[in-house]
């Protein structure tokens, strides 16, 4: 009977080293060992590992969903299928397209040739319900059209209190003030537009949300109160005054709202503002044209140099 025994190591020969094992990429270090751990596993643990390995199944990766064909089609005006459904006020079709495109921000915020998104068109056509579904699906309230108007600008300009309410209710509080203060390419905020059109309910709602009653147009510095005086809208003046505007704020030309009442027919507006305006801003400033005419000499130095001009042999007299 043969017994298993470890083979004897070859005797060391002086001046001769035993051969070293090699591995791919270089020699193995003397103490390098590789232990899978299988030898130290119990029989039951080993069988459990085998069963788990046998249960592994690789599922084939599903191909990415192909976009709907209708989502890629555009008209010559740059309108998508959703733009058209909203323009033609096809409510059921619009809602179905919105449902299928939910979360697709690129499609929902696509701008046509007038830079209008579906949300712009929903507001223009006064479809507040469609606007609400668009916002829930992921439409952006900050996108501007070719005039720089956001959907909220348009809603305020049209006086649609329902659309204004829907748009602002789906806006986070920290973002709402930025939306209210946004100006279009004419420099008008939403409050300016509602004031110009005289929509008192919209004006009051915007002010209740925190719209800046003292916001100035960048072109000439008029506030909503200046605009109300220009429009001779006494009801709007009364509404704005209730919300504590700075009645002494002047335009870039230096005019207070009270000073704009001079020469106007509506005396009640002048009476409302007179008690609130400081005395120095109740008097009209002197015209710059009058001041310049008084200070400038009748002739310039260049004109006085040529005092011997003749036409047709006759000397000109100044």
Swiss-Prot record:
<dbReference type="GO" id="GO:0043124">
    <property type="term" value="P:negative regulation of canonical NF-kappaB signal transduction"/>
</dbReference>
<feature type="repeat" description="ANK 3">
    <location>
        <begin position="186"/>
        <end position="215"/>
    </location>
</feature>
<dbReference type="GO" id="GO:0005634">
    <property type="term" value="C:nucleus"/>
</dbReference>
<feature type="repeat" description="ANK 4">
    <location>
        <begin position="220"/>
        <end position="249"/>
    </location>
</feature>
<feature type="modified residue" description="Phosphotyrosine; by Tyr-kinases">
    <location>
        <position position="46"/>
    </location>
</feature>
<feature type="repeat" description="ANK 2">
    <location>
        <begin position="147"/>
        <end position="176"/>
    </location>
</feature>
<keyword id="KW-0832">Ubl conjugation</keyword>
<feature type="modified residue" description="Phosphoserine; by IKKA and IKKB">
    <location>
        <position position="36"/>
    </location>
</feature>
<keyword id="KW-0677">Repeat</keyword>
<feature type="modified residue" description="Phosphoserine; by IKKA, IKKB and IKKE">
    <location>
        <position position="40"/>
    </location>
</feature>
<feature type="compositionally biased region" description="Basic and acidic residues">
    <location>
        <begin position="17"/>
        <end position="44"/>
    </location>
</feature>
<keyword id="KW-0597">Phosphoprotein</keyword>
<dbReference type="InterPro" id="IPR036770">
    <property type="entry name" value="Ankyrin_rpt-contain_sf"/>
</dbReference>
<keyword id="KW-0963">Cytoplasm</keyword>
<dbReference type="InterPro" id="IPR002110">
    <property type="entry name" value="Ankyrin_rpt"/>
</dbReference>
<keyword id="KW-1017">Isopeptide bond</keyword>
<dbReference type="GO" id="GO:0140311">
    <property type="term" value="F:protein sequestering activity"/>
</dbReference>
<protein>
    <recommendedName>
        <fullName>NF-kappa-B inhibitor alpha</fullName>
    </recommendedName>
</protein>
<keyword id="KW-0040">ANK repeat</keyword>
<dbReference type="InterPro" id="IPR051070">
    <property type="entry name" value="NF-kappa-B_inhibitor"/>
</dbReference>
<feature type="region of interest" description="Disordered">
    <location>
        <begin position="1"/>
        <end position="44"/>
    </location>
</feature>
<feature type="repeat" description="ANK 1">
    <location>
        <begin position="114"/>
        <end position="143"/>
    </location>
</feature>
<dbReference type="GO" id="GO:0051059">
    <property type="term" value="F:NF-kappaB binding"/>
</dbReference>
<dbReference type="GO" id="GO:0048145">
    <property type="term" value="P:regulation of fibroblast proliferation"/>
</dbReference>
<feature type="cross-link" description="Glycyl lysine isopeptide (Lys-Gly) (interchain with G-Cter in ubiquitin)">
    <location>
        <position position="21"/>
    </location>
</feature>
<dbReference type="Pfam" id="PF00023">
    <property type="entry name" value="Ank"/>
</dbReference>
<comment type="similarity">
    <text>Belongs to the NF-kappa-B inhibitor family.</text>
</comment>
<dbReference type="GO" id="GO:0005829">
    <property type="term" value="C:cytosol"/>
</dbReference>
<comment type="function">
    <text>Inhibits the activity of dimeric NF-kappa-B/REL complexes by trapping REL (RELA/p65 and NFKB1/p50) dimers in the cytoplasm by masking their nuclear localization signals. On cellular stimulation by immune and pro-inflammatory responses, becomes phosphorylated promoting ubiquitination and degradation, enabling the dimeric RELA to translocate to the nucleus and activate transcription.</text>
</comment>
<dbReference type="Pfam" id="PF12796">
    <property type="entry name" value="Ank_2"/>
</dbReference>
<keyword id="KW-0539">Nucleus</keyword>
């Amino acid at each position: 009977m043969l017994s298993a025994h470890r083979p004897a190591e070859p005797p060391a020969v002086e001046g001769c080293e035993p051969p070293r094992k090699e591995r791919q990429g270089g020699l193995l270090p003397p103490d390098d060992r590789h232990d899978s751990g299988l030898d130290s596993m119990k029989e039951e643990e080993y069988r459990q590992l085998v069963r788990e390995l046998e249960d592994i199944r690789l599922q084939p990766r599903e191909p990415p969903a192909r976009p709907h064909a209708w989502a890629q089609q555009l008209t010559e005006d740059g309108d998508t299928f959703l733009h058209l459904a909203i323009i033609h006020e096809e409510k059921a079709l619009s809602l179905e397209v919105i449902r299928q495109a939910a979360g697709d921000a690129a499609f929902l915020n696509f701008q046509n040739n007038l830079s209008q998104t579906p949300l712009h068109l929903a507001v223009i056509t006064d479809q507040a319900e469609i606007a609400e579904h668009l916002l829930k699906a992921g439409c952006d309230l900050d996108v501007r059209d070719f005039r720089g108007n956001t959907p909220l600008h348009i809603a305020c300009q049209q006086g649609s209190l329902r659309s204004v309410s829907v748009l602002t209710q789906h806006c986070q509080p920290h973002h709402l003030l930025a939306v209210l203060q946004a100006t279009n390419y004419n420099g008008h905020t939403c409050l300016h537009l509602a004031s110009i059109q005289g929509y008192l309910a919209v004006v009051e709602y915007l002010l209740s949300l925190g719209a800046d009653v003292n916001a100035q147009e960048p072109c000439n510095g008029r506030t909503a109160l200046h605009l109300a005086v220009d429009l001779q809208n006494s009801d709007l003046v009364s509404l704005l005054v209730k919300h504590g505007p700075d009645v002494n704020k002047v335009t870039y030309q230096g005019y207070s709202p009270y000073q704009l009442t001079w020469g106007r027919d509506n005396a009640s507006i002048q009476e409302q503002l007179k008690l609130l305006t400081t005395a120095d801003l109740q008097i009209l400033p002197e015209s710059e044209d009058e001041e310049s005419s008084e200070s400038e000499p009748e002739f310039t130095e260049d004109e006085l140099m040529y005092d011997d001009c003749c036409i047709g042999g006759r000397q000109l007299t100044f």
